[in-house]
């Protein structure tokens, strides 16, 4: 029902004129789900300064928690604090403790991101970030894309050659370190990274500078922070750059964060499963050449295990 008149008067009681919108009641009716069009994932209520602040603090949290955990471990062992550098490099348990310290660092990062995105609880966290599928994406399409990225990465590494990286040495330092790496790479890292890079950072940069600039900056930032742990393996760095590009383009195309998270989760999760199963697969895989039957599993394990991405 649309009210065309500019006003109505109840003559019997002398009611003063009450103005109504000429376009109709539907224009002043709030959305049924309570959502406001004022903000969206591409028009966020936070700016670049807040986004960069959360990004910087994510590194501060990692540094502080790692330092606290390592010092606590050294005090427990009654070790010389002056030799902390040497102990951390050579003690497998110290390496495990350093990896484990990233769990509270990730938790603190999410808390800070929540404060920025929600305005301290005034807005819904996930919905403000765009936590739904968007155009053309489902769980299985996202998972299939993750598998395709893994295969593409395997091809890149095969062509460029595999060089031992810092993360390789970390995973190989102990079984505990390998399992902790697999846990973080699956349970916390995909969610934290997507919230920070494709959620908080991308949204703020896109609003301020446009989609193209936002894509370029986020792709490069995400890839750049992984270079130290994968240097000097250019194949792995290239794979991470490809992953970063695809995830950011998905965010730009759909305006949503959930597909990025699922691709990231499956990409890391498959490699984490291989890390967990690696000791058992080594026992069942015969030491044969790649051309013989059954050897491909061994080749894939050896190809993927050293290159799981953690942060």
Residue ranges of model-derived segments:
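Helix-boundary and loop/linker segments of multi-pass membrane transporters
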Residues: 40-44, 87-89, 130-134, 168-177, ...
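Generic alpha-helical secondary structure signal
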Residues: 123, 137-138, 165, 177
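Interfacial segments of alpha-helical transmembrane regions
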Residues: 130-148
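N-terminal, membrane-interfacial amphipathic/helix-forming hydrophobic leader that caps
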Residues: 1-128, 154, 272-311
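Residue-level signature of transmembrane alpha-helical entry/exit and packing/kink sites
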Residues: 47-54, 94-102, 138, 142, ...
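Transmembrane helix-loop-helix hairpins at the membrane interface
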Residues: 14, 20-24, 35-37, 59-62, ...
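Generic structural microfeature
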Residues: 99, 123-125, 138, 200, ...
């Amino acid at each position: 029902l649309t009210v065309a008149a500019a006003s109505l008067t109840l003559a019997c009681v002398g009611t003063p004129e009450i103005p109504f919108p000429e376009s109709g009641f539907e224009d002043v009716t709030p959305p049924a789900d309570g959502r406001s069009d004022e903000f969206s994932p591409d028009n966020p209520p936070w700016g670049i300064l807040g986004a960069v602040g959360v990004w910087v603090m994510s590194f501060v949290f990692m540094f502080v928690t790692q330092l606290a955990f390592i010092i606590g471990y050294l005090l427990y062992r009654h070790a010389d604090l002056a030799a902390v550098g040497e102990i951390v490099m050579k003690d497998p348990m110290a390496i495990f403790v350093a990896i484990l310290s990233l769990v509270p660092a990730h938790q603190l990062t999410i808390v800070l991101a929540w404060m920025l995105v929600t305005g301290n609880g005034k807005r819904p966290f996930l919905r403000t970030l765009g936590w739904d599928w968007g155009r053309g994406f489902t769980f299985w399409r996202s998972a299939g894309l993750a598998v395709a990225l893994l295969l593409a990465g395997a091809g890149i590494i095969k062509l460029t050659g595999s060089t031992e990286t810092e993360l390789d040495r970390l995973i190989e330092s102990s079984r505990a370190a390998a399992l902790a790496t697999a846990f973080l790479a699956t349970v916390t890292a995909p969610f934290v990274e997507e919230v920070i890079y494709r959620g908080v950072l991308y949204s703020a940069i896109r609003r301020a500078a446009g989609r193209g600039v936002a894509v370029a900056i986020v792709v490069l930032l995400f890839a750049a922070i992984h270079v130290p742990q994968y240097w000097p393996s250019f194949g792995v760095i290239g794979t991470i750059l490809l992953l970063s590009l695809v995830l950011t383009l998905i965010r730009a195309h759909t305006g949503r964060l959930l597909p990025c998270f699922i691709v990231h989760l499956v990409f890391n999760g498959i490699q984490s499963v291989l890390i967990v199963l690696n000791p058992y697969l080594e026992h069942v895989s015969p030491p044969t050449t790649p051309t013989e039957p059954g050897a491909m599993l061994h080749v894939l394990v050896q190809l993927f295990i050293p290159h799981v991405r953690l942060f």
